[in-house]
Amino acid sequence: MRRRATGLLRRDSRFVLDNNLVIASVKSGWTRSTDLLFTIILSDAELYCDLELLNEYEKYIHKFLGVYPLFVLLRNRITLVDPGIDSLMSCKPYFPESQYADVVHAATCLKTAAVMITNDAHFKKINESGLIEVWNISRAIKELLG
């Protein structure tokens, strides 16, 4: 990942943050996942999100976990993307029929050339194909926090 001399992520770093990272960051107090989330949010990295993921953020962060300021911070920090039919169709074969939201998230990564950070095993096949790059949370912590 590209860093400046200050150690901060550069503007040309691009990510889509799956909801499971955000939940892991807040459900058990301050953890390395929390460090990761805020390092990314407060950096110059580009953050992308599709409408499906934004709705997941709202549902889990705001309504279930009650951490409205984090939802507002994420909502204001991300660039909302419509992945488009071509990206959706390219990603669809790698996911079970029941995982439509994951297809949309992957298509968002494909359209924006962003790294997906997730612990969702449904992304394994598409990562192995090389169509998009997927990091689990542990790898993201290692890559971005050292």
Segments from the language model and where they lie:
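Active-site neighborhoods of divalent-metal-dependent phosphate/nucleic-acid chemistry enzymes
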Residues: 80-115, 119-121, 125
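Acidic, PIN/NYN-like endoribonuclease modules and their adjacent C-terminal/linker elements
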Residues: 1-5, 54-55, 121-146
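Feature 3881 marks metal-assisted phosphotransfer/nuclease machinery
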Residues: 1-17, 25-26, 43-44, 140-146
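Short, structured coil segments at secondary-structure junctions
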Residues: 43, 74-77, 128-130
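PIN/NYN-family metal-dependent endoribonuclease catalytic core
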Residues: 14-17, 27-63
